[in-house]
């Protein structure tokens, strides 16, 4: 009898050992890993282990946790990053215009099919009779609709629990449990196909964003983006705080976001394919098509895209991923995703370190053996039109030359990160090593596919820039003496010079 469990475990063990060997041999994973920080991994020791296992970006989810607790977590994170000597970005994930249940006296309650359960404007502690709403005005909105609200379905906890509106009074929405289950504190409420008229950046979001940016976040994930105006509203607020350099990732997770995806991609710095709420708001059979479409469009415009939600969900309680999860992660890599994300697996699971290692191994294997011709052709045909034709021409030439000479890396001098991003837009076969002159730029490149950023010093001449770039590349371990590399640089003695020099060198 063929034991699938034994063979799956052997497969994962083998691929992890193989990846470790490849890493020592100088092969770099190009797909980045985002990990949500939570109770299972918020100590300095655990976060250091996650960095060593392959975490590139730490996600702080503002839907959970309080400021005092988060301050300690971020302090631990910064210490772990400093000790590791690696570049790890901090991503702040906003609540957005979401609706959640409040808290329960015992942390959770079991809802039985057919039982009555109410959603209150105000209720100190939830119990089997009902729970408070994070957006109390929803009661007023439903009451104003009268009979139109009766029979409406509410999906809780990503659709695990279903309620149907029975009646509405000034203080609560009275529901019948259509599909029961265990409902825990602060779980989401989705109303498929229903637009809730809420301000995009709430007062709580403003406080959360200011808190996160003051504590070192360099990217903000905007939840439940409905259209590009939401991105503009958030951009204006962040700029008003003096954080113009902070980047915005728009989370597309509802039908209105899908409908306006082209404009949202244009206005945002990156996109997250947030499959959890999307799978509740939109028929789940549409998810694969939407995921592939979003990834293609984002990559072709030279931006980064994160594929998120339930990537390795079973590893919340199990030490090995399922075969379906392995295929899901690999297919996201084949689609061209810039990054993959862990949520509960790292934040609240039993095996956060093993989850990171599994992602690291699966992504590396998929990158090495995947077929990316269709993606490259799409990017060539539909790719962005760079406002700097010299930069785009040199980057495109660098990719072709690197492929022709079998270069082990493309080394770029990138003071702002723009050249490195322009370079990976063309998806070269070899990694891109970006030599930056600020830690901020290094952190901002943490989400970009195929880029390893290292700190360098400000140099003036092409020769000194090239020499430093080659030395820094050697220090990464990605390349070694005798390897062929392609080097992009500029001459700082010329005030109008951009990246204008391309060299093929042997280290």
Question: Which stretches of residues belong to each language-model region?
Answer:
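Short, Lys/Arg-enriched N-terminal segments with co-localized hydrophobic residues
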Residues: 1-27
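Non-catalytic helical/linker scaffolds that mediate oligomerization, partner binding
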Residues: 19-507
